[in-house]
Design a protein with these regions (language model features):
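Positively charged, low-complexity intrinsically disordered leader regions
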Residues: 1-30
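Helix-enriched interaction subdomains in cytosolic or periplasmic regions
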Residues: 1-10, 87, 103-110
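Short beta-strand segments enriched in small/hydrophobic residues
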Residues: 31-40
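Glycine-rich phosphate/diphosphate-binding loop of Rossmann-like nucleotide-binding domains
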Residues: 39-54, 136-191
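Short beta-strand elements in bilobed, periplasmic/extracellular small-molecule ligand-binding domains
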Residues: 56-70, 184-188
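Non-catalytic terminal and connector segments of soluble metabolic enzymes
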Residues: 58, 83-85, 112-115
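Short, well-structured alpha-helical segments in soluble
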Residues: 76-88
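Anion-binding alpha/beta catalytic cores of soluble intermediary-metabolism enzymes, centered on
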Residues: 92-156, 160, 174
C-alpha cells in the first residue's frame, strides 16, 4: 500500500527550525539577509517574489531587493551580483530566471559566488552536489525531495530509487543526493 508524504508538515517543521536559527543569529548581532535579484516585471516572477518575501518574513530573514528594468544590460546585472557577492551583510542570493534574452545565462550564473547561491544554479553549487562537498547549495527541488524523505524517516540505504528526468536543476542533483544516501538510483528520461 502506498503512503502519501505530505509537504505541509515538513514545511512547518523547517519553518520552526529556521526561525529558531534566525533568532540565535540575531542574538549574536547577525541579521540573516537574502538578496532577491530580479530583471523585469514578469508576473510569474512577481508572484514568486511575493511568496519569498512572505516565507522569509515568517522565519525572520531580511530581504534586500535588487530590481533591474527588463532592458537592463548584462554589465548592470553583473555589477549587482558583484555588490551581492562582496556585501558581508547579505548571506544568500536568489537570482530570478529565466533572464531576458540579452543576457548570457552561463556568464551571469558564473558571476554569483556559490556560497551565496541558495538556489543551486551556479556551476560551483552543482560541483558541490556532484562531489559531495560543502561548496554552495543543492538545487531547491532536489533538496526538498530529500528533506521530505528524511522527515518521514524513509530508509534510503540499500533501497532502489527511480528519478524521472535528468535536468541539472532537479533530476541529476536528486540522483546524486540519493546516491550519497547509499540508494541504488535509476535515472529515467524520455529518450
Amino acid at each position: 500500500m502506498a503512503t502519501i508524504l505530505k509537504g505541509a508538515p515538513v514545511v512547518a517543521a523547517m519553518n520552526e527550525r529556521n526561525a529558531a536559527l534566525c533568532e540565535q543569529l540575531k542574538a549574536k548581532g547577525i541579521t540573516p539577509t537574502l538578496a532577491v535579484v530580479r530583471v523585469g516585471e514578469r508576473e510569474d516572477d512577481l508572484s514568486y517574489e511575493r511568496g519569498v518575501m512572505t516565507r522569509c518574513g515568517k522565519v525572520g530573514v531580511a530581504v534586500k531587493q535588487f530590481v533591474l528594468p527588463a532592458d537592463a544590460t548584462q554589465e548592470q546585472l553583473l555589477r549587482v551580483l558583484d555588490e551581492v557577492n562582496t556585501d558581508d551583510g547579505i548571506h544568500g542570493c536568489l537570482l530570478f530566471r529565466p533572464l531576458p534574452k540579452q543576457f548570457d545565462d552561463r556568464t551571469v550564473r558564473a558571476a554569483l559566488r556559490p556560497e551565496k547561491d541558495i538556489d543551486g544554479i551556479t556551476d560551483g553549487s552543482l560541483a558541490g552536489v556532484f562531489t559531495n562537498t560543502d561548496l554552495g547549495y543543492a538545487p531547491c527541488t532536489a533538496q526538498a525531495c530529500l528533506e521530505i524523505l528524511k522527515y518521514y524517516n524513509v530508509p534510503l540505504s540499500g533501497k532502489r530509487a527511480v528519478v524521472v528526468g535528468r535536468s541539472l536543476v532537479v533530476g541529476k542533483p536528486a540522483a546524486m543526493m540519493l546516491d550519497r544516501e547509499n540508494a541504488t538510483v535509476t535515472l529515467c528520461n524520455s529518450r
